[in-house]
């Protein structure tokens, strides 16, 4: 009979049920990539708006999920990335301080642009019985749009608050928001307006 594996001290936790979930895409970033300097200012503004929205939604029992790129480093973990970005000066460090993850927030790492692709997100949302997504993050015309597209294909109801996303140019952001509204049927009202009402039991 084999020996028992050593105790890790990690206890499984029961996932909360949350019909609506807040998905924060790629806000935790060094901004150290081509175009990062153009994204920095708008990203910080989007992070501040997303932080205010997160606080309001948390009061309503909405769970926040951070979905962040692993940057191709398969040994990486989310909290190490947070620690790295906290030590940075400028917008990258300020974004992390504004949107610093809380104890009851959930986190996943993603290997590609969409938060759904090759990640545990879909299983996580199923376990939480989530039917509506509020998608905020970077960049509007890349990871946010592709995540919204995958959510649309999976028949989630999606709200992409226009002031809680950022792109390298205003035209890129506006074009992506228009596409998500027209083609992906996303609500793109800003976070300063009342949130969309909950989806009915019949869908």
Language-model segments: what does each one mean?
Residues 35, 77, 118:
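Short acidic, gly/pro-rich beta-turn/loop elements at beta-sheet edges
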Residues 63-64, 68-83:
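Early exported N-terminus immediately downstream of N-terminal targeting peptides
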Residues 36-39, 79-82, 133:
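Short, basic, glycine/proline-bearing loop/turn elements
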Residues 1-21, 52-60, 84-203:
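Active-site-adjacent betaalpha module
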């Amino acid at each position: 009979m084999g020996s028992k594996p050593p105790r890790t001290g990690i206890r499984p936790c029961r996932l909360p049920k949350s019909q609506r979930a807040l998905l924060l895409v790629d806000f935790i970033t060094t901004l150290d990539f081509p175009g990062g300097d153009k994204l920095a200012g708008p990203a910080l503004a989007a992070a501040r708006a997303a932080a205010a929205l997160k606080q309001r939604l948390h009061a309503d029992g909405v769970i926040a999920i951070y979905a962040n790129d692993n940057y191709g480093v398969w040994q990486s973990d989310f909290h190490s990335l947070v620690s790295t970005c906290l030590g940075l000066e400028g917008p990258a460090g300020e974004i992390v301080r504004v949107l610093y993850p809380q104890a009851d927030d959930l986190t996943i790492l993603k290997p590609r642009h969409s938060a759904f692709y090759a990640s545990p997100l879909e299983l996580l949302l199923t376990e939480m019985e989530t039917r509506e997504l509020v998608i905020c993050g970077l960049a509007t015309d890349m990871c946010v749009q592709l995540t919204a597209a995958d959510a649309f294909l999976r028949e989630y109801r999606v709200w992409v608050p226009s002031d809680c996303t950022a792109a390298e140019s205003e035209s890129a952001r506006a074009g992506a928001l228009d596409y998500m509204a027209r083609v992906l049927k996303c609500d793109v009202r800003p976070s300063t307006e009342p949130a969309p009402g909950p989806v009915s039991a019949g869908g």
